[in-house]
Amino acid sequence: MKQKFIFVTGGVVSSIGKGLTAASLGALLEGRGHKVTIMKFDPYLNVDPGTMSPLQHGEVYVTEDGAETDLDLGHYERFTSALMNRSNSVSTGQIYDTVLNRERRGDYLGGTVQVIPHITEEIKARIYEAAQGSEIILVEIGGTVGDIESQPFLEAIRQMRIDVGQENSVLVHVTYVPYIAAAGELKSKPTQHSVKELREIGLQPDFLVCRSEKVIDDNLKAKIGLFCSVKPENVIAAQDSRFIYEVPLALHREKLDELIVARLGLSAGKLNMKGWQNLVKILGNPSHTVKIGVVGKYVDLKESYKSLHEALVHGGVANNARVEIIYVDSEKVTDKTVHSLLGKVDGILVPGGFGTRGVEGKITAIKYAREKRVPFFGICFGMQLSAIEFARNVCGIKDATSREFHAENKRTGNFVIDSMAEQRGVINKGGTMRLGAFPCAIASGSRAYQVYKASSIMERHRHRFEFNNKYKDLFEKNGMMASGICKERDLVEIVELPDHPWFVGVQFHPEFKSKPLAPHPLFVHFVKASLKKK
């Protein structure tokens, strides 16, 4: 059987939900027994999002093989069993970088290098590469139809649909149908114009997924279908859901998966979505509520912590609880304000981050959690700061710090957190950190061992700095245990306080491996401990 290609585009506005649509459709096709993968094209000129501000781009999602990617890849992995890698996330910057390097080497034999065919051929080559080993590949095109940046990708899709045959490809266009309160009705004109933009470049959508606040009835579907040359049954209503994990079930109710399977000549299989149904049931009617305070510096944009947010939700579901996440700006946390900001939460989490802004506020929050015996979870930078707090306030090293905070001077001192040897002298920032999955050996009898129920694990990393081993004996003497070690490099990956209700810091990012139907055990146990504190 030939591979099948499902292209997902978006119109009218950005952030319309293309990624969730692709991920949800992937979940439905998997539920019917098909092997899927999903890839994302981002139209920006950055090579990857690794050096972009989270406040502009949202979180950087790290894959097993160490690629720094768009947060939509997190949706793809959470909604399906597919494992993403660097071939699943491609930017305009990567495409141009590859083509221009070939030109410099003389690979084009003196020919004029142009968007068509050179850029479009490279785009198609990336799709074929990502599709290897899968039966179906869903390809999300970032941006909005009509944007200049997206045009080469749309042209490549037009060519591919001819190359692979219309019977082996489907174009799903996600659009927006706004509700005009003054008129009391939904308006289809923006969708019509968005499809018109697609048709002008030779693309006719097979399916329209219409986002809306209100119910789209059959009459409006028929109207949209008529003006957009789409069968009315292929106009899919996608009303706003309470939870993102309702989206696969909502699309199934509209028969999107059935229609696409039939359109591509695939086996319908027997759909099994019981896990998703149970998940939504718990989310809609939990037995408990728990408050978790997340102390960070990127709180103005919640998507900066997207995977973290979802992992906490997963941990709540495993405990039949709704997790109320309270985001706290670390710059506002001081000795005077910490109790008013965190006094009513049941657990405190300090996530990853970079730089000095807001550091002392995070350290104050960690001290509060340790002294008040509030369940605490430190991730990456949060783990490093928990070590600094412990060094200052328990071990008596008042000038304990991280070399990251003094990178531009030659200060010597108590660098409890120090740069790894291979990071010293690194000039380029992009793609040069310790990235991807690495092994960690867990000490028997530790809380980490109780959580994982395993002596060896693999977790994903994104950092330049590590715990300084010359302080390890002093820390353990004063009560902080190094319970997880990367033995290949003798790097401390997990620290914990055995005499605290729940105080764990990890150098890696467990949120990247949490799924709604398979919550990460660290988040399950953190939420469980927070419920006990409540």
UniProtKB/Swiss-Prot annotation:
The keyword Cell inner membrane does not apply. ATP binds at S15, I16, G17, K18, G19, L20, D72. CTP binds at S14, D147, I148, E149, K187, S188, K189, P190, T191, Q192, K223. GO terms for biological process: 'de novo' CTP biosynthetic process; pyrimidine nucleobase biosynthetic process. Its EC number is 6.3.4.2. Allosterically activated by GTP, when glutamine is the substrate; GTP has no effect on the reaction when ammonia is the substrate. The allosteric effector GTP functions by stabilizing the protein conformation that binds the tetrahedral intermediate(s) formed during glutamine hydrolysis. Inhibited by the product CTP, via allosteric rather than competitive inhibition. Pathway: Pyrimidine metabolism; CTP biosynthesis via de novo pathway; CTP from UDP: step 2/2. SUPFAM superfamilies: Class I glutamine amidotransferase-like, P-loop containing nucleoside triphosphate hydrolases. Residues 291-534 form the Glutamine amidotransferase type-1 domain. One of its GO terms (molecular function) is metal ion binding. GO terms for cellular component: cytosol. The active site is at C380 (nucleophile), H509, E511. It catalyses: UTP + L-glutamine + ATP + H2O = CTP + L-glutamate + ADP + phosphate + 2 H(+); L-glutamine + H2O = L-glutamate + NH4(+); UTP + NH4(+) + ATP = CTP + ADP + phosphate + 2 H(+). Gene3D superfamilies: 3.40.50.880, P-loop containing nucleotide triphosphate hydrolases. It is an enzyme of class 6 (ligase). Mg(2+) binds at D72, E140. The keyword ATP-binding applies. Keywords: ATP-binding, Glutamine amidotransferase, Ligase, Magnesium, Metal-binding, Nucleotide-binding, Pyrimidine biosynthesis. Residues 1-266 are annotated as: Amidoligase domain. UTP binds at S14, K187, S188, K189, P190, T191, Q192, K223. InterPro entries: Class_I_gatase-like (IPR029062), CTP_synthase (IPR004468), CTP_synthase_N (IPR017456), GATASE (IPR017926), GATase1_CTP_Synthase (IPR033828), P-loop_NTPase (IPR027417). Homotetramer. CTPSs have evolved a hybrid strategy for distinguishing between UTP and CTP. The overlapping regions of the product feedback inhibitory and substrate sites recognize a common feature in both compounds, the triphosphate moiety. To differentiate isosteric substrate and product pyrimidine rings, an additional pocket far from the expected kinase/ligase catalytic site, specifically recognizes the cytosine and ribose portions of the product inhibitor. Catalyzes the ATP-dependent amination of UTP to CTP with either L-glutamine or ammonia as the source of nitrogen. Regulates intracellular CTP levels through interactions with the four ribonucleotide triphosphates. Belongs to the CTP synthase family. This is CTP synthase. The lineage of its organism: Bacteria, Pseudomonadati, Bdellovibrionota, Bdellovibrionia, Bdellovibrionales.
